[in-house]
UniProtKB/Swiss-Prot annotation:
This is DNA repair protein RecO. Transmembrane segments: none annotated. Gene3D superfamilies: Nucleic acid-binding proteins (2.40.50.140), Recombination protein O, C-terminal domain (1.20.1440.120). Pfam families: RecO_C, RecO_N. GO terms for biological process: DNA recombination; double-strand break repair. The keyword DNA repair applies. The gene is recO. InterPro entries: ARFGAP/RecO, DNA_rep/recomb_RecO_N, NA-bd_OB-fold, RecO, RecO_C. PANTHER family: DNA REPAIR PROTEIN RECO (PTHR33991:SF1). The keyword DNA damage applies. Signal peptide: none annotated.
């Protein structure tokens, strides 16, 4: 069975044999899937340069099992120019998708969010708002439901100036305790509006998404985060 030609990106690739690659793809219509790219490691293979992260592709594959066989891959546009921190951030986004979304689950909305995220990483001077927005959009699609507008204890509307402590599976409860789980009401209101224009809100959002994504990622560290940390240390 051969798929229709559809848009997609390479999330990750690794050797499969002396001449082939195992490639994780994220496609517009079929979601995430893994394919064998036969002969892609051969010296004369045109796929060697095509199957790269951050290159918009047109893809077709065959097979009914979980592991498909790549039949066609060609660039749909030029590779998005991610450099330095933006490049490591792109690897981080790819690793998130590889680890938290189920295989072969169509999600065109997430594909559009991903495309906009990569475009933002390639063009924006400050990439933090782009990353935080994508993380929140991903959490929404994963079904992570949390009320940012009401106190989980009293049901009262969140107060801009008060502090709230996050409790997993319950939400935010008004609290005077200040630790890693504590957020200002103004942060929660900004989260609801997906407004990450303020630096303090971005820092709070980064802290929250690390907490919220942990159940999906488990205890295994993100390789992209380790790679970023190692390279920052080398530059110092």
């Amino acid at each position: 069975m051969q798929s229709e030609l559809q848009r997609g990106f390479v999330l990750h690739r690794r050797p499969y044999s002396e001449t082939s690659l195992l490639v994780d793809l994220f496609t517009e219509e079929s979601g995430r899937l893994t394919v064998i790219a036969k002969g892609a490691r051969a010296k004369r293979s045109s796929w060697k340069s095509v199957l790269q992260p951050f290159t918009p592709l047109l893809l077709r594959w065959t097979g009914k099992s979980t592991l498909k066989t790549l039949a066609k891959a060609e660039p749909a546009a030029i590779t998005l120019p991610l450099q330095q921190i933006a490049l490591y951030s792109g690897f981080y986004v790819n690793e998130l998708l590889t680890r938290v979304i189920e295989s072969e689950t169509p999600n065109p909305a997430l594909f559009q969010h991903y495309l906009k995220c990569l475009t933002g990483l390639a063009t924006e001077t400050n990439i933090e708002p782009t990353l935080r927005l994508f993380e929140f959009q991903l959490l929404q699609i994963l079904g992570y439901g949390v009320d940012f507008l009401h106190c989980a204890g009293s049901g009262e509307p969140v107060d801009f100036s008060m502090t709230y402590r996050y409790r997993e599976e319950k939400g935010f409860i008004a609290s005077l305790v200040k630790d890693n789980l504590t957020f200002y009401g103004r942060d929660l209101l900004a989260f609801e509006a997906l407004d990450f224009s303020d630096d303090a809100v971005r820092q709070a959002a980064k802290r929250f998404t690390r907490i919220a994504l942990k159940p999906y990622l488990g205890d295994k560290p993100l390789k992209s985060r380790e790679l970023f940390t190692q390279n920052i240390l080398l530059l110092k």
